[in-house]
């Protein structure tokens, strides 16, 4: 990127030249010198424009633009010459207003788009795949009721005809993921829906992702959905009790943002869970009893409403209530609940309005599984009362399943009176045969292929941000938002190349500065979309300056970038065992980038801090690491021996790289399965932990490793042995504190 000028479109321009009124047109010229070569040069004009401008580059008309506010215009600059070049503008006032304003910044772009091409052409859309149930919720194990875990084979696809005429489906078929041929005479009425289920087609819809194609009688591709089970795709459709619903028939069915998990929250019913147990630990256990608490937690990601929580000692006689806040009526909606600790994977839980309109409830939300002393919702018993192993305790609460896992575990610390309840879920899932509940009046523009360049900019070097944008209504505006060091958001217009690729330029910054950005696109019907989808809550980040990483003599280099506040929370010792995943950006070998990856600390509590810290990074399946892995581990404990038995080249607490060498030898010599480890130089998200050489662990003992090692090794349930670690004090000695 080569800046030719600067402007801040948020600030109304101060007139430098006051133009005389009443003119039919105004003319401007700007010359600049250029040396060097560019394979695909483009000129980007961004700023404020009121009127119509004709742009001439070296005497050739290259673009015309009409605007009443901020604008972005990307122009083919193949006429770029060594030496002097001339940009000329002809500004024509709008007929409806005598005002003319021109305050544009120009940047020269290299125009490279090979890393992220424009979106493919829109599919015909005469009939669309409108809803998919590819992984119905299973039957969950419930030993108390003698129910074993069982997968649910039910699968179905819904087609929708959004047109005004019926469509003859004779000879049409599904291909790739499943095989199904529509019979002769099959019709889909105008505005109608048609469902094909697993009893009709051959093959299955893969739970981890598949490509579903619909072809007409001439074998032309009518629609295509390359769905996945996670990442940018709605995770709740993967056995979480929801289906994939298209948000609008004209939305691009190939993109994850065009789909949403069906909303099942209105279908589930309240239920009351009540059971009794003594205060004794399970026979043969030696669990700690230092804390006196009631705990709730999901065994996987899930959501439920909770109300009327009660733990009663001697329920038939003394009836002593031990829960201090079981109704949540004194709490503030949108915040945490008084006397409760909502931690780790359950940290997004909050008080909500009762769906019946009266009172308040706890919206218990888990991003992943609960654990024995953290990553749960917990509350200290009234008066910090210790449990009596000979007394009876009655535990009761109301629950209403909302989404995800229905496996809700309740217990008294540590593992007394423990029970996992399978919350009741609605029998019907999704909206087969009818309009989607998540359908929008109009979907915003489709965005794909976001990338900033250079990935690791030097000080003062402008950064180009580009992505592909498309919309059937046409694009009205694309705006690039950016924040410097978590400061106030600023904006700059983006310009298109006429082929669906849009560009914006961010100003250069000093070494060490960190910039977060996202794009807002609005179509001509007024619908808006953000990319990454979370907008300001997403994490597309770059840091200025190399930080010495490129000079390291390690083949693989990885940079993990987080907002400072997020990184501080990630490494906060109080929350050291949290498994909540924070959004981040990952750059690998300064060539590949992942925005909105997810990271948490890993290892046992004592291995999550200092020079032993490790990171578990999760990538979306739409862009796996090295084309295969959806999660990796960076093990900061790194030991490298000299190799001659005389000591270490690098030494810290933890395993040596010799283990990697032994695995590699065994794998090559005897085809013995290995966990595919490597060495990486890792740039940590903050200086406190220090950049370092580290072990890059890829498969570990995940399903891909088990599949290579054993026949059907990834099938069934994987059990993990876990040692019991527990805190012995709080920050201030108060048992209700952290």
Task: Give residue ranges: language-model regions.
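Glycan-association/targeting regions that enable binding to alpha-glucans and other polysaccharides
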Residues: 266, 425-588, 592
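Extended carbohydrate-recognition surfaces in non-catalytic/accessory domains of CAZymes
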Residues: 1-40, 73-74
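Activation on beta-sandwich/Ig-like modules and their edge loops
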Residues: 54-78, 83, 109-266
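Extracellular acidic, Ser/Thr/Pro-rich low-complexity tracts
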Residues: 34-36, 49-51, 93, 161, ...
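Aromatic-lined ligand-binding clefts that engage carbohydrates, nucleic acids, or primary amines
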Residues: 2-3, 24, 32, 36-59, ...
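Phosphate/dinucleotide-binding and metal-coordinating scaffold of catalytic cores
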Residues: 47, 439-440, 445, 512, ...
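An acidic-aromatic loop/edge-strand motif
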Residues: 1, 77-117, 222, 435-437
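Extracellular and organelle-lumenal recognition/adhesion modules and their flexible linkers in secreted
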Residues: 263-442
């Amino acid at each position: 990127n080569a800046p030719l000028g600067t402007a801040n479109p948020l600030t109304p321009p101060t007139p430098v030249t006051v133009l005389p009124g009443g003119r039919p047109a105004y003319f401007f010229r700007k010359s600049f010198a250029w040396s060097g070569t560019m394979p695909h040069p483009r000129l980007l004009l961004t700023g404020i424009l009121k009127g119509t401008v004709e742009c001439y580059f070296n005497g050739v008309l290259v673009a015309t633009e009409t605007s009443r506010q901020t604008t972005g215009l990307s122009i083919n600059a193949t006429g770029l010459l060594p030496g002097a070049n001339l940009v000329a503008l002809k500004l024509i006032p709008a007929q409806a207003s005598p005002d003319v304003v021109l305050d544009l910044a120009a940047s020269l772009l290299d125009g490279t788009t090979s890393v992220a091409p424009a979106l493919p052409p829109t599919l015909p859309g005469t009939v669309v795949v409108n809803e998919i149930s590819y992984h119905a919720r299973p039957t969950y194990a419930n030993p108390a009721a003698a129910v074993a875990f069982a997968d649910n084979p039910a699968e179905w696809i819904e087609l929708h005809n959004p047109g005004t005429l019926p469509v003859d489906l004779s000879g049409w078929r599904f291909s790739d993921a499943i095989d199904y041929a529509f019979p002769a005479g099959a019709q889909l009425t105008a505005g109608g829906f048609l469902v094909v289920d697993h009893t009709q087609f051959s093959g299955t819809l893969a739970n981890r992702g598949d490509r579903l194609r619909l072809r007409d009688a001439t074998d032309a591709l009518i629609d295509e959905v390359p769905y996945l089970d996670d990442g940018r795709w709605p995770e709740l459709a993967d056995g979480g009790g929801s289906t994939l619903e298209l948000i609008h028939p004209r939305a691009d069915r190939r993109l994850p943002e065009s789909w949403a998990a069906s909303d099942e929250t209105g279908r589930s019913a309240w239920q009351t869970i009540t059971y009794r147990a003594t205060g004794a630990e399970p026979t043969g256990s030696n669990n700690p009893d230092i804390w006196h608490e009631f705990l709730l937690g999901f065994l996987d990601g899930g959501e439920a409403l909770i109300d009327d929580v009660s733990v009663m000692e001697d329920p038939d006689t003394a009836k002593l209530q031990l829960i201090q806040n079981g109704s949540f009526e004194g709490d503030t909606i949108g915040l945490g609940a008084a006397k409760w600790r909502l931690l780790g994977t359950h940290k997004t839980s909050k008080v909500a309005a009762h769906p019946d309109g009266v009172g308040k409830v706890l919206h218990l939300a888990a991003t992943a599984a609960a654990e024995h002393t953290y990553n749960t919702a917990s509350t200290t018993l009234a008066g910090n009362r210790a449990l009596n192993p000979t007394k009876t305790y009655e535990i009761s609460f109301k629950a209403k399943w909302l989404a995800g896992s229905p496996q809700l575990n309740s217990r008294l610390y540590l593992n007394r009176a423990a029970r996992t309840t399978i919350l009741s879920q609605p029998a019907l899932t999704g909206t087969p045969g009818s309009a989607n509940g998540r359908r929008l009046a109009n979907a915003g523009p489709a965005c794909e292929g976001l990338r900033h360049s250079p990935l690791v900019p030097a000080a003062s070097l402008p950064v180009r941000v580009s992505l592909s944008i498309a919309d059937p209504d046409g694009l009205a505006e694309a705006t690039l938002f950016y924040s410097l060091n978590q400061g106030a958001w600023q904006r700059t217009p983006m310009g298109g190349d006429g082929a669906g690729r849009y560009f914006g330029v961010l100003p250069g910054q000093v070494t060490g500065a960190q910039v977060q950005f996202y794009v807002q696109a609005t179509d001509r019907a007024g619908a808006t979309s953000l990319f990454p989808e979370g907008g300001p809550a997403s994490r597309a980040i770059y840091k200025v300056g190399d930080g010495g990483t490129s000079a390291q003599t390690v083949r693989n280099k990885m940079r993990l970038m987080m907002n400072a506040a997020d990184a501080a929370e990630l490494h906060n010792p109080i929350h050291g065992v949290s498994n909540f995943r924070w959004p981040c950006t990952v750059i690998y070998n300064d060539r590949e980038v992942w925005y909105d990856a997810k990271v948490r600390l890993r290892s046992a509590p004592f291995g999550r801090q200092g020079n032993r810290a490790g990171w578990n990074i999760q990538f979306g399946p739409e862009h796996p690491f090295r084309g295969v892995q959806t999660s990796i581990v960076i093990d900061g404990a790194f030991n490298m021996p000299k190799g001659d038995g005389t000591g270490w080249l690098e030494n810290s607490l933890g395993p040596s790289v010799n283990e990697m060498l032994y695995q590699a030898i065994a794998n090559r010599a005897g085809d013995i399965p290995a966990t595919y480890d490597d060495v990486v130089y890792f740039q940590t998200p903050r200086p406190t932990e220090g950049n370092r050489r580290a072990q890059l662990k890829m498969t570990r003992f995940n399903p891909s490793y088990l599949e290579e090692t054993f026949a059907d090794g990834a099938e069934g349930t994987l059990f993990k042995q876990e040692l019991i670690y527990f805190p012995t004090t709080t920050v201030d000695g108060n048992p209700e504190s952290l």
